């Protein structure tokens, strides 16, 4: 965080139990960081995605470490769901991208990701009240330092579940070799369901890190990941459960106009995040429960979130 912020002050108490952190302006620019191997790159990207549009200069962040693990959102999931979501709020352009240069599984890492994001002065309000029906499913089955057949076995088992519901399914295999394959063996699957209204719902699973717990079969991983996607589709909404907090933050920071967003059941993380929004921005959301009719077959109960943005303006942005 200190790499991209013009720091004012960081003080650590002598006993190491207290940290005083006073940030300055969000400077941005080109940064490189070797992420701690206790968490994956997705853990760091979650914060970067929230801050990147409000930098002084366009951000180019090169992050090295673990790209895929069972704990944090993987880079594949963030690229497939978060970037399209942010584009709905007006955060887009040629310089908005997330690339996997090297793939690194837990626990050794060795992956590399490049995230680029333009700056924006304001965030536009949104009206996302209808998710629409699922029109297609896409995915990536990745593997490193194991047999390439692992990816094919994952794809076959996942399709065995999903083909019962929709024919338009394409899951490609990504097997990186040599220097691009990181330091640890592993495999996994990321699935994304796209709706007729351009909403994205996702699910993912990764193999157990080497030396940690019982190994998982690729067939079991593929089937279980497909079932997780079906559960996410049942929950529904215009944003999947892993990205609810980001969408609500962008609604809060939007122009002083009404924004509406239809979500599935709120996750515990999102509920706590709403408390933070209330404390820091004094914004309270109007929450309406939407119960689908029995003949609609639209999954579980939904929640319509409504708020008026604070009208945040990016004062860090360079004037040209």
Go through each PLM region and give its residues:
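Structural preference for solvent-exposed beta-strand-turn elements
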Residues: 1-320
